[in-house]
Amino acid sequence: MSRSIDLAVIPGDGIGQEVVAQGLKVLNAVLPQDVKLETKEYDLGAQRWHRTGDTLPDAELEALKGHDAILLGAIGDPSVPSGVLERGLLLKLRFAFDHFINLRPSKLFPNTATPLAGRPDIDFVVVREGTEGPYTGNGGSLRTGTPAEVATEVSLNTAYGVERVVRDAFERAAARPRKKLTLVHKNNVLVYAGHLWKNTFDKVAAEYPQVSTDYLHVDAATIFFVTQPERFDVIVTDNLFGDILTDLAAAVSGGIGLAASGNINPTGAFPSMFEPVHGSAPDIAGQGKADPTATVLSVALLLRHLGYEAEAARIEDAVSADLAERDGSVARTTDEIGDALAVRVAS
């Protein structure tokens, strides 16, 4: 395990600046004294686009490659046309760094606002494919803007891409106590892509006899996320279904404000990126109202990815304890929550 961390920091837009500052505060507090943390901040996002028209210049993309990991705050602003930052920055990073795993843990923490509160058995992970599906830009339109317009959005699925994400999901399931993996797709209608996923899943399953498996159509999975979340341990699915399911998973386990995520390159060829799921919330930016918990939990994912398991667990324990003590009667600022978590992980 490396005894130094070279971290790229992209605060981004809106509340991103505030929550990233708290994530770094907790990171500095939890690391052992013999671990050297170096950070470099990158000015990317809406303000940069307004000033220069740049989203992610090639020079900065090249510089980002040299870091061990990336911590991202939030990207997006209503003053920027939809899709400019999403495709020009976030998706460009994801594809350039081959982040083929989007990792989204879903765990019910104590004292959280959800209709499923009081069910301690909600603890699963969604492994979403990150570089294929309908997000590759494979499509187009004819006779655009006319009553006869035709639009296509093609979902790209390759045997190579599917197998590597399925294999990663089996590895994660094998390392967890329950050792269960569920494939989610819609192979009764999406027969070509669906059969590629199911056949690959079944082939790889033969190499992991210790992992129990099952399959669900995506519509059934959405029902069970709400009615039987305890049935899930690790879930693997494609890019589009995963995008939808992970937000539902966040809702049933306490809300997007507590949801962390990792865009992972498991090979280590490129740095992985970790970020809270929530948006930039420009309506509350700069007011100290943003809860940095999701960013702090993203820091835990980052540490675990880099091999700092004990430190990651301390952050998660601190978050659990902090949430358990919240009663809603006193509103704390962003800084106050970050300070409290930093004290807990350092003690």
Curated annotation (Swiss-Prot):
Enzyme Commission number(s): 1.1.1.85
Pfam families per UniProt: Iso_dh (PF00180)
Residues involved in NAD(+) binding: G279, S280, A281, P282, D283, I284, A285, G286, Q287, G288, K289, A290, D291
Positions with a binding annotation for Mg(2+): D219, D243, D247
Reactions catalysed: (2R,3S)-3-isopropylmalate + NAD(+) = 4-methyl-2-oxopentanoate + CO2 + NADH
PROSITE patterns cross-referenced by the UniProt entry: IDH_IMDH
Record carries keyword Magnesium: yes
Keywords: Amino-acid biosynthesis, Branched-chain amino acid biosynthesis, Cytoplasm, Leucine biosynthesis, Magnesium, Manganese, Metal-binding, NAD, Oxidoreductase
Any one Gene Ontology cellular component term annotated for this protein: cytoplasm
Pathway: Amino-acid biosynthesis; L-leucine biosynthesis; L-leucine from 3-methyl-2-oxobutanoate: step 3/4
Function description: Catalyzes the oxidation of 3-carboxy-2-hydroxy-4-methylpentanoate (3-isopropylmalate) to 3-carboxy-4-methyl-2-oxopentanoate. The product decarboxylates to 4-methyl-2 oxopentanoate.
Subunit and interaction comment: Homodimer.
Entry's family note: Belongs to the isocitrate and isopropylmalate dehydrogenases family. LeuB type 2 subfamily.
Name the UniProt record assigns to this protein: 3-isopropylmalate dehydrogenase
Native source species: Streptomyces griseus subsp. griseus (strain JCM 4626 / CBS 651.72 / NBRC 13350 / KCC S-0626 / ISP 5235)
